Amino acid sequence: MRFRIYKRKVLILTLVVAACGFVLWSSNGRQRKSDALGPPLLDAEPVRGAGHLAVSVGIRRVSNESAAPLVPAVPRPEVDNLTLRYRSLVYQLNFDQMLRNVGNDGTWSPGELVLVVQVHNRPEYLRLLIDSLRKAQGIQEVLVIFSHDFWSAEINSLISRVDFCPVLQVFFPFSIQLYPNEFPGSDPRDCPRDLKKNAALKLGCINAEYPDSFGHYREAKFSQTKHHWWWKLHFVWERVKVLQDYTGLILFLEEDHYLAPDFYHVFKKMWKLKQQECPGCDVLSLGTYTTIRSFYGIADKVDVKTWKSTEHNMGLALTRDAYQKLIECTDTFCTYDDYNWDWTLQYLTLACLPKIWKVLVPQAPRIFHAGDCGMHHKKTCRPSTQSAQIESLLNSNKQYLFPETLVIGEKFPMAAISPPRKNGGWGDIRDHELCKSYRRLQ
């Protein structure tokens, strides 16, 4: 009798466990199905611990992370499921390349200009850029590609409201956010920035053999911008399907730029002038950082100069031919010890490109840098103040905008320009090899 009672209890318990298991399995199955059928998680919050500052051109600064005490190398952490889901989603979105604000008949093709905006995590400035685009004449003809290295609900919401031009979003697949605890992010086994090489070798940190030119070890947040820029350059020219046979120009912007309402009007006239009077010009730029109070007498003039990274890195426009010459310099770009993409380009004009770059640039700028604060500046970020100053300048000169013709104002002597100095931050062989690999990625 005791044996039969015990058997009955075991049977009942088994049935209860089986029923609970079935309920849990059904619940998970429904969730998986919901995830599979639901829209992409473009409005999801960023991965934990992924907040990083944007990097601008300037001198490399010591971050608070560098002051961490020395600790022995630790085992590599496991990747959490949320991070893996984001990696998978980024891959899928980059493959799908869903265009918005175009017809569904499959006949749409880009015009003579495409904009590519490198976006990090400054939505307050991105909002200003989008507002300036909205005011630009002819913008409905221009494809705008937003290239992201940070995923946030606020940023994606901003871009979802762009209804005035064709839009494509792509995502840098090797961001710190997608690799928060391993390379290309910050691996806990990496050497601390200021550790001497001998001490690093004794400690056994994984990049001990590869400090930069100043004896410092890599900091992921400084390395990311150069990685993103080079990946984006290759991806838009080689992997964006709608641009496979594109013969126009691509204008490269950043999230803290601001465009004049006649930028597209002026750009088209610059391109025509380049073809007619400056066939030797390699690139176009929409402006410099020089402070201008009045457009009087200069609104219809452009100059021919030697390209200089500290002056002509805003609104840089490249043809496919210029891109192909750049990509042939992949090894030089990817191994030059400077974490700034533009100062590295300056080095390429001396060390690798067939000749120094000749740039066509307007005397009255059609692009402005609204984000003159942040990592390399001590100013407080006040986007509304900066945008008000730019709008005031444009309003006070609106009678000079949209010139009927453009003429070359000055042709400056062409002379090689060396980078002011090498900033370092790019000595790690892992950065070199990842950077080189973008050319091989499908």
UniProtKB/Swiss-Prot annotation:
<feature type="disulfide bond">
    <location>
        <begin position="373"/>
        <end position="381"/>
    </location>
</feature>
<dbReference type="InterPro" id="IPR007754">
    <property type="entry name" value="GlcNAc_II"/>
</dbReference>
<keyword id="KW-0735">Signal-anchor</keyword>
<keyword id="KW-0808">Transferase</keyword>
<feature type="glycosylation site" description="N-linked (GlcNAc...) asparagine">
    <location>
        <position position="81"/>
    </location>
</feature>
<dbReference type="GO" id="GO:0018279">
    <property type="term" value="P:protein N-linked glycosylation via asparagine"/>
</dbReference>
<feature type="topological domain" description="Cytoplasmic">
    <location>
        <begin position="1"/>
        <end position="9"/>
    </location>
</feature>
<feature type="disulfide bond">
    <location>
        <begin position="278"/>
        <end position="281"/>
    </location>
</feature>
<keyword id="KW-1015">Disulfide bond</keyword>
<feature type="topological domain" description="Lumenal">
    <location>
        <begin position="30"/>
        <end position="442"/>
    </location>
</feature>
<comment type="similarity">
    <text>Belongs to the glycosyltransferase 16 (GT16) protein family.</text>
</comment>
<dbReference type="GO" id="GO:0009312">
    <property type="term" value="P:oligosaccharide biosynthetic process"/>
</dbReference>
<dbReference type="Pfam" id="PF05060">
    <property type="entry name" value="MGAT2"/>
</dbReference>
<keyword id="KW-1133">Transmembrane helix</keyword>
<dbReference type="GO" id="GO:0005795">
    <property type="term" value="C:Golgi stack"/>
</dbReference>
<feature type="binding site">
    <location>
        <position position="293"/>
    </location>
    <ligand>
        <name>substrate</name>
    </ligand>
</feature>
<keyword id="KW-0328">Glycosyltransferase</keyword>
<feature type="disulfide bond">
    <location>
        <begin position="329"/>
        <end position="352"/>
    </location>
</feature>
<dbReference type="GO" id="GO:0000139">
    <property type="term" value="C:Golgi membrane"/>
</dbReference>
<keyword id="KW-0479">Metal-binding</keyword>
<feature type="binding site">
    <location>
        <position position="149"/>
    </location>
    <ligand>
        <name>substrate</name>
    </ligand>
</feature>
<feature type="glycosylation site" description="N-linked (GlcNAc...) asparagine">
    <location>
        <position position="64"/>
    </location>
</feature>
<feature type="disulfide bond">
    <location>
        <begin position="334"/>
        <end position="435"/>
    </location>
</feature>
<keyword id="KW-0472">Membrane</keyword>
<feature type="binding site">
    <location>
        <begin position="224"/>
        <end position="228"/>
    </location>
    <ligand>
        <name>substrate</name>
    </ligand>
</feature>
<keyword id="KW-0325">Glycoprotein</keyword>
<feature type="transmembrane region" description="Helical; Signal-anchor for type II membrane protein">
    <location>
        <begin position="10"/>
        <end position="29"/>
    </location>
</feature>
<dbReference type="GO" id="GO:0042803">
    <property type="term" value="F:protein homodimerization activity"/>
</dbReference>
<comment type="function">
    <text>Plays an essential role in protein N-glycosylation. Catalyzes the transfer of N-acetylglucosamine (GlcNAc) onto the free terminal mannose moiety in the core structure of the nascent N-linked glycan chain, giving rise to the second branch in complex glycans.</text>
</comment>
<keyword id="KW-0464">Manganese</keyword>
<comment type="subunit">
    <text>Homodimer.</text>
</comment>
<feature type="binding site">
    <location>
        <position position="369"/>
    </location>
    <ligand>
        <name>Mn(2+)</name>
    </ligand>
</feature>
<dbReference type="GO" id="GO:0008455">
    <property type="term" value="F:alpha-1,6-mannosylglycoprotein 2-beta-N-acetylglucosaminyltransferase activity"/>
</dbReference>
<keyword id="KW-0812">Transmembrane</keyword>
<feature type="disulfide bond">
    <location>
        <begin position="191"/>
        <end position="205"/>
    </location>
</feature>
<feature type="binding site">
    <location>
        <begin position="118"/>
        <end position="122"/>
    </location>
    <ligand>
        <name>substrate</name>
    </ligand>
</feature>
<comment type="pathway">
    <text>Protein modification; protein glycosylation.</text>
</comment>
<feature type="binding site">
    <location>
        <position position="256"/>
    </location>
    <ligand>
        <name>Mn(2+)</name>
    </ligand>
</feature>
<dbReference type="InterPro" id="IPR029044">
    <property type="entry name" value="Nucleotide-diphossugar_trans"/>
</dbReference>
<protein>
    <recommendedName>
        <fullName>Alpha-1,6-mannosyl-glycoprotein 2-beta-N-acetylglucosaminyltransferase</fullName>
        <ecNumber>2.4.1.143</ecNumber>
    </recommendedName>
</protein>
<dbReference type="GO" id="GO:0030145">
    <property type="term" value="F:manganese ion binding"/>
</dbReference>
<keyword id="KW-0333">Golgi apparatus</keyword>
